[in-house]
Amino acid sequence: PCCHALIEAGIAKVVCAITDPNPQVAGNGFAKLRAAGVHVEMDDAAGQACRELNIGFFSRMVRGTPWVRMKAATSLDGVTALHNGQSQWITGPAARADGHAWRARACAILTGIGTVLQDNPRLNVREVQTPRQPRIVVVDSKLDMPLDAHVLKAPGACTIYTSSTNAPKTQALQALGATVVVMPNAAGKVDLAA
């Protein structure tokens, strides 16, 4: 833990924005610092900014689930596609750039097979600079993923969660670099809670 390095370095005062929610640590570092004579001060005003900066970590530690941010584009009347099912750009350039900025912050982008079949999205970050592409995750109960889908060609890794045990299709997807995870629930759908 970092508290040992701080003690060994002879640091006299540590100002923290938030207590580490990791149950393996659970604030024990503060106790060790204080026991070693280090003055520990909490800066509560910076706590919210710290939580926002590390929201995914805090969600995993406190709730045991990843932080999920949903992005959807709809017209003023709440429609996401034309009446014939055709998809078209609803948002303008500024909104798309904002969406890509949020996408760049994500570890993974999740979609369902319906979106892949209807829109054939790329789901990668294109409009902002990023050091890495988020992992693409597709929930596909029946393993309907087309072998020419853009998500299989994207620079980020693609993971497909399915309830299907279709070995030939699994092998074909794996040959294209996808990871296929079979996780059926009792109803034969993908076990999202697992």
Where do the language-model regions lie?
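Histidine/acidic-residue-rich, glycine-tolerant segments that coordinate divalent metal ions
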Residues: 21, 50-61
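Zn2+-dependent cytidine deaminase-like catalytic core
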Residues: 1-50, 135, 159, 163-166, ...
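Active-site ligand-binding patch in enzyme domains
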Residues: 2, 56-59, 63-194
